[in-house]
Amino acid sequence: MSILIKNVLHKDTITDVLIEGNRIARIAPNLTTPEGAEVIDGTDKAVIPGFINTHTHAAMTLFRGYGDDLPLMEWLEDYIWPVEAEMTAHDVYVGARLACLEMLRSGTTCFLDMYMHPLETARAVEELGLRAHLSYTLFDQGGAERAALDRKRSYEYYEAFKAFSDRITFTLGPHAIYTVSGEQLQFCHKFAVEHNVKINLHLAETKGEVDECVRQHGLTPVRYLEKLGILSEHLIVAHVVWVDDEEMDLLAKHRVSVVHNPASNMKLCSGYTFKYEEMKKRGIRLGIGTDGCSSSNNLDMVIAMKLASLLGKAWRFSPTATKAADIYHSATIGGAEILEIPAGRIAEGMLADLSLVDLNVPELVPLNSLTSNLVYATSGSSCIDTVIIDGVIRMRDRYVLGQEEIIAEAREVARRLFGHG
């Protein structure tokens, strides 16, 4: 299948973009329309790479607005985990479909997820056409029996994911160092190396986590992981607010990827001094995440970019920190590098994972800088008009096929879980 986008803005130039199969084939003005190609009029639109959300919990869209304004551990132990214990696999599927819809409508084409029932999330992703790396979440607080079950399920899920399209990739998701034992973390590392998959881990999110790690192990979180021998290019760590210079050196040395989640870090008061500039100087691969809707309330990567940029400026008292271009890079190319996919750029040979931005929305006028306008002036749900993933149109004219049914079913499940939807 071919798609030709005509007269679209790309790098300050009006041009055409030809998609053949699932790749961007040509970028040039006045391209000839291939026989049978679908033509999209790009007038008054800009083509941009799809955003890559490198940390979220998709099905937690169902928790939006529940348990707000609470500290992390009270929020988890008294609000989130009790409801999750009541959720069915179908609930996860419904919440994940709502998440995929929300991400499509705000220009996200790929995401890294961590949640229970990953096959249900995979089913939702398959149906709505996104690209995703989906983690099986491991906890072993239940002792040796639970740890053994998680190891068994890791192998089972790895095999089960082979039934899905190549847009969907299996990863391991040990929840955190305070919910997963050192032995289980070492299992995850061994599994990741043997099967060439990623490990998705919360790390150094709060000061309390760091203090408890020092109390239990005599080491801060990053040093603890180094002692366990699991720092590697397979590891993706989210939050990483409470780290020192030596720990950042270790992350860089072992090619660990780091994901900044500004919304949840601020909302839960986990910490705000994310050391973006220091990590960037060390060559650490940096991504941007929305986190789940239970802690950030939306999955809009455009809003996440604005928060990441402004937060970095605010705590440093430096208007030149966390520049719009750098944050935009982390939300696109940075995410692609972390997940090792040929995406994140509008260039010939790249995956056709892209969005068309409506340049006629008021907050994008005038267009002195598209990058600055995207990071500082708008939201994805306001300005994204069309989304193409893997060479297939998944949203056009702000409409996703079946969106009414997705929203209605999510409301029904939320009413059962929370009493209202």
Each language-model region and where it sits:
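His/Asp/Glu-enriched, well-ordered alpha-helical/loop segment
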Residues: 227-234, 276-361, 375-379
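Histidine/acidic-residue-rich catalytic or RNA/ligand-binding cores of hydrolases
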Residues: 207-219, 247-249, 269-279, 296-313
